[in-house]
Amino acid sequence: FKAQVRLSEEYGLPLIIHCVKAMDELLAVKKEFRPQQAWVWHGFRGKPEQAMQLLKKGFYLSFGEYYPDETMQTVPDERLFLETDNSSLDIEDILCRAAKVRGVEVEALRETIRRNIQNVFFRA
């Protein structure tokens, strides 16, 4: 994993992270490297408290089909991504559910996600 962190930094690319039951180790690596590139937690399903801990450390959180509603509600717009990964759902279905959970219009959330993609993956 540390080699991937080095590559992310060397090439100026965000790091997409699949982490299961290793949050403390992940946070230790982040503290060790103090990366300049964005770290995106793929398929986040944790509790709001875990989300807040990660957000304070600068993570972006990406949500798929399964997540606690309260967690989705705690993530600020500028740190949010949506994904389908291995889901049978279309991204539009995930977008609609997330908008409902967050209490926003679908188009507003679509624009938020588009802006985040632009800022993280296509910044100059």
Locate each region found by the language model.
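Histidine/acidic-residue-rich catalytic or RNA/ligand-binding cores of hydrolases
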Residues: 26-28, 51, 72, 90-96
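Positions that flank functional sites
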Residues: 22-23, 69, 114
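Divalent metal-binding pocket/active-site signature
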Residues: 1-57, 103-104
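Active-site metal-binding loops of divalent metal-dependent hydrolases
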Residues: 19, 43, 59, 65-67, ...
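Mid-to-C-terminal alpha-helical segments outside catalytic/metal-binding sites
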Residues: 6-11, 95-124
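Acidic, glycine-centered active-site loop in nucleotide-sugar glycosyltransferases
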Residues: 34-35, 76-78
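Short amphipathic alpha-helices and their capping/turn segments at secondary-structure boundaries
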Residues: 69-77
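Short acidic/histidine-rich active-site segments
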Residues: 78-90
